């Protein structure tokens, strides 16, 4: 896939600093270090658009990336095992909840799971919240390239036990990029 015109717009720690141009938004949600930023980079064809790190918790604000002047890909802070003070973690939680509940321009979310780890309680809480609020989402299973075929199948089967069909993704091979774009495009066309 060729690179899209994608640009970093703002890193927001407060709702009043979110973009105000009313473009539709696609949110990327998941635990710390699950591959949200890598997925955004793969989707846009820009290896360094979203900052990636092996250290959990590097994304500490909501980052907005405008794509082709038509919509935003939104990288949210991860939840889970990031080594940050409790106060920061609570601020992230409040910020994320506010964004998910009140952001009118949020049209679709990618709930990202590490195929090796599957569902954890906070992932299930988020899934239940999205279901309860009628927020459309796609479950993306990342890091498939770190598993052999039988391990991948076992991980995907475990994710399916929650009644969803995960879309496998690999940042290394690009597996799943086309299918994720199809889901995003379908959502944006329906708006």
Curated annotation (Swiss-Prot):
Coiled coil: none annotated. Mg(2+) binds at residues 37, 59. It holds the Pfam family MMR_HSR1. Its cofactor is Mg(2+). Keywords: Cell cycle, Cell division, GTP-binding, Magnesium, Metal-binding, Nucleotide-binding, Septation. Residues 22-190 form the EngB-type G domain. GTP binds at residues 30-37, 57-61, 75-78, 142-145, 169-171. One of its GO terms (molecular function) is metal ion binding. One of its GO terms (biological process) is division septum assembly. Necessary for normal cell division and for the maintenance of normal septation. Belongs to the TRAFAC class TrmE-Era-EngA-EngB-Septin-like GTPase superfamily. EngB GTPase family. This is Probable GTP-binding protein EngB. The gene is engB.
């Amino acid at each position: 896939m060729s690179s899209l015109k994608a640009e970093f717009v703002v890193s927001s720690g407060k709702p009043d600093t979110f973009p105000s141009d009313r473009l539709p938004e696609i949110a990327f949600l998941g635990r710390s270090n699950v591959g949200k930023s890598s997925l955004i980079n793969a989707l846009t064809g820009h290896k360094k658009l979203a900052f990636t790190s092996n250290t959990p918790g590097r994304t500490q604000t909501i980052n907005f990336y405008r794509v082709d002047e038509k919509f935003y890909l939104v990288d949210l802070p991860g939840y889970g095992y990031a080594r940050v003070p409790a106060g920061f973690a609570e601020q992230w939680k409040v910020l994320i909840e506010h964004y998910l509940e009140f952001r009118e321009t949020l049209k679709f979310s990618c709930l990202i799971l590490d195929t090796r780890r599957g569902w954890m309680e906070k992932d299930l809480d988020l899934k239940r919240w999205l279901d309860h609020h009628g927020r459309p989402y796609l479950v993306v299973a990342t890091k498939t390239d770190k598993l052999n075929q039988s391990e991948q199948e076992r991980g995907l089967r475990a994710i399916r036990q929650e009644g969803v069909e995960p879309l496998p993704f690999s940042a290394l091979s690009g597996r799943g990029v086309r299918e994720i774009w199809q889901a995003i495009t379908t959502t944006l066309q329906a708006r």
